[in-house]
Amino acid sequence: MTDNKIYWDQLKKTDPRFTKRINKGFGEITTIDPQWQIGKMTEVFGPVGIGWGYTVQYTYTEQLVFAEVSIWTEAYSNIYGPVCSVQKLWRKTGALDDEAPKKAMTDAMTKALSHLGVSADVFLGMFDNSKYVEKVAAEYKSLNKSKVTEMKGNT
């Protein structure tokens, strides 16, 4: 037996409280709160900038912004990426979308983190199964209760 999936197994389950179902025009997808993903990486690897981190490279055209994100863990030599995402710089109204770089970066980061196993259950389509989501929600609820009890015991 190897430890090849040690991190994947710690990162794969997503707390349903930090997901949203949205319609993208081609069907519904589950989105994941990026702050939750950052918290999950911090839980497993330590603080951003110490146990893990990311780099972002932006490229702009007249109409688009591209964000290339690379993720590193434990040592900067353990790096994955870049993973790219693109967003339109202009809204349909003709106004500049000043959130476009952030949207591109967040999407690229989510994609890069998925390769490490973060929220693998969402990307594997398991959130399309309501029984699975209920089971994971119950697991997280129980885990959160035990953390609250532990915190009360330490005060």
PLM regions with names:
Residues 26, 116, 150-152:
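Intrinsically disordered, low-complexity segments enriched in polar/charged small residues
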Residues 1-34:
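N-terminal, Lys/Arg- and Ser/Thr-rich interaction peptides
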Residues 32-138:
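Positively charged, aromatic-enriched nucleic acid-contacting surfaces
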Residues 2, 6, 132-155:
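Interfaces that engage single-stranded nucleic acids at replication/repair/recombination sites
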